[in-house]
Every structure is written in C-alpha cells, then in structure tokens.
Curated annotation (Swiss-Prot):
Chain ranges passing through the membrane: none
Keywords in alphabetical order: Glycolysis, Oxidoreductase, Thiamine pyrophosphate
Cofactor: thiamine diphosphate
Pfam families given in the database record: E1_dh, OxoGdeHyase_C, Transket_pyr
Cellular-component GO terms for this entry: cytosol; oxoglutarate dehydrogenase complex
CDD domains: TPP_E1_OGDC_like
Entry's Gene Ontology molecular function annotations: oxoglutarate dehydrogenase (succinyl-transferring) activity; thiamine pyrophosphate binding
E.C. number: 1.2.4.2
Catalytic reactions on record: N(6)-[(R)-lipoyl]-L-lysyl-[protein] + 2-oxoglutarate + H(+) = N(6)-[(R)-S(8)-succinyldihydrolipoyl]-L-lysyl-[protein] + CO2
Function: E1 component of the 2-oxoglutarate dehydrogenase (OGDH) complex which catalyzes the decarboxylation of 2-oxoglutarate, the first step in the conversion of 2-oxoglutarate to succinyl-CoA and CO(2).
Provenance organism: Staphylococcus epidermidis (strain ATCC 12228 / FDA PCI 1200)
Name of the protein: 2-oxoglutarate dehydrogenase E1 component
Signal peptide coordinates: none
Oligomer and partners: Homodimer. Part of the 2-oxoglutarate dehydrogenase (OGDH) complex composed of E1 (2-oxoglutarate dehydrogenase), E2 (dihydrolipoamide succinyltransferase) and E3 (dihydrolipoamide dehydrogenase); the complex contains multiple copies of the three enzymatic components (E1, E2 and E3).
Length: 934
C-alpha cells in the first residue's frame, strides 16, 4: 500500500494516534524507499541493515507489542509511550508521591525489548536529535527516559498544531545546556535563603499571625525573578502578575522589593508608609478602609533585571482565581496603542501576564476556563499568559481525590491546546529550565503555557490551622522533609560550589537582616485613629460636561458616519435605516434616537482625544439591532467601522463581540481600565439579567476597589433593563443590587428616558476619566425605548446643555397636587399615558440619576408646589426589587410629613416578572392607572 506523501508530512510528528500510519509507511519503505517522503527516507535509512526483520517474541499481555511485530515497530511504540505518558512516572513529587493505577507500558521490557537488541539499532530511530550524539537506540532511550521521567514532566502531544508539537519535541529532546554558572547558582541559593528566612522570621516573631506561607513552593519566587529577567532580555518592560494570598507576602517582598520594614510594620499594626522608598520606585496605594495585607498589590519600577521594567502585582480579594481576567485586561491595555486613529495596534512584546493559581482552585473555579478561552481571541489575546500552578496538593483540608476528577489539576488546560510542564518544586534548577522553555514557547507562538509547580504546604491553610487533624499521614512526612533552601544548599556543597560554612552564613545572615529591619520600627507608633473618610474628590456626584457644539459640527460628524467607501455595499434594508439618521439635520421634525445619540457622543469623545473600547455579546450590531457600529458588505462580507473615520479623530475606537462569558469579560474590561485610566471602557450585557454572572466582579472590584485598595476605575456598564413581557429572565438587570452597593459616591447609577441626556451623560463620564473624580457608571439601558419617539430628541438638545439628574415638565405650579417620580421605561409609559389623558394636577418627574440620589434637585421642585398633597414613587419592578427600597429613606426625608408618600408598582415577588406577555400588560396597565388615579 502506498500513502500520499503530503498526507504524512502534514500529519503529527509525535505519532500518537498516527503511530499506525508511521508503521505502515515504514513497511512501504522496506518495499520501495521512494514511496515515502524524503524526510522519512532519511530517518528510515539510519536503521541498521536487517534489524527491522528481527521478529518479536510472542506476547500474551496485550500491552506493548503484538506477536509478529517488527522490532522497529515495538521501539517506536515504546518511544511514543514515553513521550505521551512518561509524565506519569516522572520525579515531580518532593514528598508523598501518589500511587498511579493503570499506567501505560513505559519500560523496555514491556515491549519485549532488551539492551542487546536496542544496541543494534541506530539512535536516530528514537529521535532525530540523538542520531549524532548517541551510538545506539539503547543509549538514546535511556536519555529519553531521564528526560521524560525526570524532575520536569512534559505534556504536549495533545496539542493540535503540528509546528508547536515539533518545536516542543525538539526543545525537550535536544540535550539541554544548563543556563546557570556557579555564580548564578550561588545567587539562586541566596534568593532561596531570603525566601525561606523571611517566612521563618515571621513564623517565630508573630506566632499565629496569618501570612499564608509560601513554604513548600518556595521556588516560585526565583521562578518569577528569572521570568522577569528573561522578559527584560526580550524587551518586555511591563509585567503584570496576579495571584491569591498564598505566598503573596513573599512575592511582594522579594519580587516587588517591598522593604522588610514595611512588611514587619504591617504585622505590628504600625505605619508602614514611613519606610516607603523615597526614590519613587515602589507604588503602594490603599483606600480609606484598606484591606488585609495579603490582598494588597503594588507596582515596582526597577532596573534590577537589565532594563527599566514596571512590575505590577494586582490587588486581589479572597475570591480565588477571579483576578485572572483582571490581569489579562491590564496586560492588553499595556500592549494597546490607543493614541492613534482607527483601531488600536497591539504589541505583545510590550507586556506579559503571569497568573499564579492554586491547585485546588484552578480546576475548581470556572473563571479560569473563561479566561483561558480569551487567550486567542482578537479582542482579548495578550500574546500568551504564563500560568503557574502553585501545587501544594491540598485545598484547605481537601485532598485531590475529593477536589477534582482529573489526574492533574492542570488537566483542564489541555482543552485550550497549550503545553503543560509539571516540575518538582524541590529541584531548583529544573524550575528555572521550565521557565526558560515556557518563555521561549511564548515568544515563538504567542500562546499560553501552564507550569504545574508541584510541592507541598509546610503548615496548615493558615498559620493558626492544624493540618494533622484532617491530613495526618501526609504531614508526618512533610515535617520530616528538608526545605528546598537546605536541599539546594547541600547540593551546592556537594558540588563544591560553596562550603557548608558559607551556606550557614547566608542562612544566618537573612535572620540578621530581618532583625535589623524589625529594630527600626517603633512598636508604640500605632495607627489608632486611621482616616476612614472618602477622599475630597468623591464628595460630589459626577459633574456634567458643558461643552457646546454647533449644528454644523454635529452634522459634519453625522455625514461622515454615513459616508462609506465606494466599493462597500451596505445591506439595502439596513442602509434605509441608517439613512434616516440624516433627518434630524434635514427635517424640522427629525429626531435623534438612542443609537444615533450614542454614535454622536462617541464621535465627539474621540475628537476630544479619549479612546473608547466597547465589548459584549453582539455589541458590534447591538442585541436589539440598533447600534450597527460595524457594517458588513453584503457581497463579500468585508467590514467597515464608521467610528474609525471621525473627522479630527484623536484616539482609537475599539469594539468587539465578546465570547459568551460575563465574569471574565467584565474582569478583563475592569483590568483594562485600571491600567489605562484614560480609556472609556464599556461592557454591554446582552440582557441586563445576565449581568449577575459577574456579580463577584461588581462586589469585589467595581464597587469597592477604591475604598479597599485606592484603585480607581471608570468602567461603564450598559445593562438592558425594562419590563416588556419577556418573562423573568429578560426583564431585570437587578437594579436593586447596584443601588445596594452604592455608597460613598463609589459609582453613578442611571435609568434614563432621554436620548439627549444619554449623549450628555456619556460625555460627562468620558471627561471624568483619568481624574481623581472618576468612578464606574452603571446604565440601565433601554430595549423598546431604543426606537421610541418620546425618548428621541431634536438636535438642539445635543448642541448645548448638559446631563440632567432629573427631568421635569412645564406646568402650572398652582394646580399641582401630586408629584409622580419614576425612571426609565416606567417614566415613558406614564408620560405617554398622560399625553393621552391630560391631568393638570399631576407633575411627572423623571429621576434619571438614581445614585447619587438627586435630593436637592427634587427638593427644589417640591418647594415650588404650594398645593402639593402627595408624592408617589412608581416603578415596574416588584416592591422588594428595583429602586423603591433605596429611594424610600430619601423620599421620606423629603416629604417630612408634609405630604403623603405612596408606592405604586408590582407587589413583592420572588421572581422579577410574569412569564406571560398578556398578564404582563394587565399588570403594567394596573400600575399606571393606579398611580394616576389614586
């Protein structure tokens, strides 16, 4: 049988499932060498004459060989098994190695082979990288076993991309020349001594204090240091690190170089800022309520690694793994050039992310899968994240058998087609090589790499915890196990690189350094009365932008947005819709609807020099087919983005349809905005109802980051919200939750009823970016109101004015007996009802900004109504949801027993809305009529 030559050359070199094809091709070669590709002719020619005809010994074990197989076929099967499964017998466990069941055949004997037979075969059949190094297949296989079963275990045969597999195979099997000379090994030992000495000192001097020790995976710190050095060699100047609490204090101290004095001060509850380096190289921020020490991050600017680099450790809550997309977003922001026209350009060599995981949390938390899914997407890729799993093989008290369904905690990463390296945390030099392989792979392919750093946990989950209660046997062995500091020190002593006295001198010297730092701190300098007031910059609500625009200016923008290339063919049906956007400038009755108001706002913001990034599911078109920010040629599918062609544009416009993810995408956009505070970042939910998939991002980052960490964000959320008969899962963005989180002017929450007010709001938010006044903006965006003529406004409302927290009507104040307050679609429903059923005794007020609540503005209106008897709040949400419970205390204070205060809306409900559209209409009508007539 003759195979197509192309069929093999495009097939995997690491045979795997294609091993049968390889063996068939070898049989073809024996019959006719010209029947196989030239590269295989070269490989097969290295086999010594006659050796392929040595018959296999009969076997009945069903394992490695089959009766009658040639020796070469059995050798190939052995080699293939070593590559695929050698990791299962690798020396990657410092202590308490697991018992492996049903491990595939990996030994020479399993394939009815022996040394004598293998010595007759060329080493080239084992690996093309061995043919000029080893005399025969036996020596080459011994080398392969050492490589694949050593302190680094490799998993890469699952990768679909042939080039990546070939590259990894070559890198793994090419004899490795150690990158560390004797002096570097000495320095590496000193680093380890500082890592462990730091932990020992704190353990001894602050007994029982939580620090979430790094001990057991100490080599993480030199791995990070080496990564930063290699990144510097590549010219990467921005390093973004994300990690949870374990080992964080050590990373802060030895990677970001936070002084020992500062760290010890935090344990003593004295003021650490007295010891902040005066050269400005270390940036540490904190909010007015602050956070525990093992959540805090920082930024270090350093030349320690060869070039000036900015190393950032992201602030992190206790919620494991949720910082991963934040770090990815921060990295992408550092890579993007937003100071140009059109879309931003991305340079993967400007920044890189390092995301550190826990072995229990990595497979357990879905945010990791969402984040890894972003890795190769145009709008989110960072050119490859370095993932390091600090694998201490336990989660609090839960052992792997109860914590995951896979062999390794890293197995979930295989679905994302990335290489996985397992490395023994006690083999210091192996951990350095693992980093070097990972960095070389990232540089070559711009993809994620996972390093599983396999170690242990010296103490319990925290230092007050006794692990032997639930894990007695493993901890008997851990307590007897020498630390990596001692193991590596002894190794260097044995190699003659240092003496035992030098080793002990280094270890003792770290304790002296720590004691010297400790002695500098005045234990009486307690922070008894910390300032917990929000900063002055947050005393006022978001201020309106009052810039005026001429009619001609806005018309020029609008015309440019409708000017497409001559060879671009807009879908005819869509073109008719878009052409109507000329009417506000050409017809007296023409109105600007929501989508056009947004486009005009974005265009003027770009002219002001503020870049915009908008992402979300279906955001390019808009869930409700209203935005059309990216147009598609109906003949060839090419795309055109009008906002890339704004006259006098000074910054980029970036828009992407996101994957079907909420938590990771919101985290990514949050991180992007934190890193690039001048960028107008917007995340749009497909429906507001789905935004609660990101609730942890809202709770732990968006609403509280500034109070905890001094971390400013101006992220904007568009959350479609309105009760329109679409059922309980397509009605509510859970407005009440955002209002519950609102405090200390930490955000702006709006539910708008006017396209022009939307225009001015967006401009106000953009103007606040990269100032001390910036804060998140939460918009309950419309659905049916997108095309509502009551919401649409004439162009003169856009040329001047500013954002209005409330909107009132022109009315005879002497006649008003009742004020109705409502927002969003509820206000429009009431307005349209009153237009058909006029009532001079009712004043309808649109509360556009719910937080900060416009008390003074409403108070002024109420004071002007001498015959007022009743104030009513009307909403479409159930009474226990929506804004009512939030606004009630404000309204109660405003009426001050002068007027009746009543509520009109749905009764308290467990589910937000009715499932039947007709019942919805009945309930909605009842709310409107009740509020008007009662």
């Amino acid at each position: 049988m003759t195979k197509n030559k192309k069929e093999f050359t495009e097939a995997p070199v690491n045979f795997g499932a294609n091993l049968g094809l390889m063996l068939d091709l070898y049989d073809d070669y024996l019959q006719d060498p010209s029947s196989v590709p030239e590269d295989l002719q070269v490989l097969f020619s290295t086999i010594k004459t006659g050796e392929a005809h040595i018959e296999a010994k009969p076997t009945t074990d069903g394992g490695g060989s089959q009766a009658g197989d040639s020796t070469i076929k059995r050798v190939m099967r052995l080699i293939d098994n070593i590559r695929q499964y050698g990791h299962l017998k690798a020396d990657i466990y410092p202590v308490n190695p697991p018992e492996r069941q049903n491990v595939p055949k990996l030994e020479i004997e399993d394939f009815d082979l022996d040394k004598e037979t293998l010595e007759k075969i060329s080493s080239g059949i084992v690996s093309e990288h061995f043919k000029d190094i080893y005399d025969n297949a036996y020596d080459a296989i011994v080398r392969m076993e050492r490589r694949y079963k050593g302190p680094i275990a490799f998993e890469y045969t699952h990768i679909n991309n042939n080039k990546e597999r070939v590259w990894l195979k070559r890198r793994i099997e090419t004899p490795y020349k150690a990158s560390l000379n004797d002096n570097q090994k000495k320095e590496l030992f000193k680093k380890l001594a500082h890592v462990e000495g730091f932990e020992k000192y704190l353990h001894k001097n602050f007994v029982g204090a939580k620090r979430f020790s790094i001990e057991g995976v100490d080599t993480l710190v030199p791995m990070l240091q080496h990564t930063i050095t290699l990144a510097g060699n590549e010219g990467i100047k921005n390093i973004q690190i994300g990690m949870a609490h374990r080992g964080r204090l050590n990373v802060l101290t030895h990677v970001l170089e936070k002084p020992y004095e500062m760290m010890i001060s935090e344990f003593m509850h004295t003021d650490p800022m007295k010891f902040l380096p005066e050269d400005g190289s270390l940036e540490l921020t904190s909010g007015w309520t602050s956070d525990v020490k093992y959540h805090l991050g920082g930024v270090k600017t350093t030349n320690s690694y060869g070039i000036e680099q900015r190393i950032s450790l992201a602030n992190n809550p206790s919620h494991l793994e949720i910082v991963a997309p934040v770090v990815a977003g921060k990295t992408r922001a550092a890579q993007d050039n937003t100071h140009q026209v059109g879309a931003p350009s991305t340079d993967f060599h400007k920044a890189m992310p390092i995301i550190i995981h826990g072995d229990a949390a990595y497979p357990g938390q879905g945010i990791n899968f969402e984040t890894m899914n972003l890795g190769s997407l145009k709008g989110y890729s960072t050119g490859g994240s370095l993932h390091i799993i600090t694998n201490n093989r336990i989660g609090f008290t839960t052992e792997p058998i109860d914590g995951r369904s896979t062999t390794y905690s890293s197995d979930v990463a295989k679905g994302y087609d990335v290489p996985i390296l397992h490395v023994n945390a006690d083999d210091v030099e192996a951990t350095i090589e693992a980093i070097e392989i990972a960095m070389e792979f990232r540089k070559e392919f711009h993809k994620d790499v996972v390093i599983d750093l396999v170690g242990y946990r010296r103490y319990g989950h925290n230092e007050m915890d006794e692990p032997s209660i639930t894990n007695p046997v493993p901890y008997q062995n851990i307590r007897k196990h020498d630390s990596v500091e001692i193991l590596y020190g002894k190794k260097l002593v044995d190699e003659g690189i240092i003496s035992e006295d030098e080793m002990n001198e280094v270890i003792d010297g770290v304790q002296k350094e720590m004691r010297t730092a400790h002695d500098k701190i005045d234990k009486n300098d307690k922070m008894n009365n910390p300032d917990m007031e929000k900063p002055e910059s947050l005393q006022l609500p978001l201020q309106s932008d009052t810039k005026d625009f001429s009619f001609d200016h806005l018309k020029e923008i609008n015309d440019a947005m409708l000017d497409y290339p001559k060879d671009f063919h807009v879908l005819k049906k869509l073109n008719k819709v878009l052409e109507k956007r000329r009417e506000p400038f050409e017809k007296e009755e023409g109105l600007v609807d929501w989508a056009q108001a947004e486009q005009l706002a974005f265009a003027t913001i770009l002219q002001d020099g503020t870049s915009i990034r908008l992402t979300g599911q279906d955001s390019e078109r808009g869930t409700f087919s209203h935005r059309h920010a990216v147009l598609h040629d109906e003949e060839n599918g090419n795309t055109f983005t009008p906002l890339h062609h704004v006259p006098q544009q000074q910054a980029t416009f970036d828009i992407h349809n996101s994957p079907l993810s909420e938590a990771a995408v919101v985290g990514f956009e949050y991180g992007y905005n934190v890193e690039n505070k001048g960028n107008f970042n917007i995340w749009e939910a497909q429906y507001g109802d789905f935004s609660n998939m990101s609730q942890m991002m809202f709770d732990n980052f968006l609403s509280s980051s500034r109070a905890k960490w001094g971390e400013r964000s101006g992220l904007t959320l568009f959350l479609p919200h309105a009760f329109e008969g679409q059922g309980p899962e397509h009605s509510s963005a859970r407005l009440e939750r955002f209002l519950q989180l609102a405090a200390e002017n930490n955000s702006t929450v709006v539910n708008l009823s006017s396209a022009s007010n939307y225009f001015h709001l967006l401009r106000a938010q953009a103007a606040s970016l990269d100032t001390l006044e910036m804060r998140p903006l939460i918009v309950m965006s419309p659905k049916s109101l997108l095309r509502n003529k009551t919401v649409a406004k004439p162009i003169d409302e856009f040329t001047s004015g500013g954002f209005k927290p409330i909107i009132t009507e022109d009315i005879d104040e002497q006649k008003v007996k009742k004020v109705i307050l409502a927002s969003g679609k509820m206000y429009i429903d009431l307005k349209e009802y009153l237009a058909k059923n006029p009532n001079d005794s009712i004043l309808l007020i649109a509360v556009e900004r719910l937080y900060p609540f416009p008390e003074e503005e409403i108070k002024e209106v109420l004071k002007s109504l001498p015959h007022l008897e009743n104030v009513s709040w009307v909403q479409e949400e159930p009474k226990n949801q929506g804004a009512w419970l939030f606004v009630y205390p404000y309204l109660k204070a405003l009426v001050a027993n002068k007027y009746d205060l009543t509520y009109h809306g749905r009764i308290q409900r467990a589910a937000p809305a009715e499932g039947d559209g007709e019942i919805h209409k009945l309930v909605q009508t009842k709310i409107i009529e009740s509020s008007i007539n009662n």
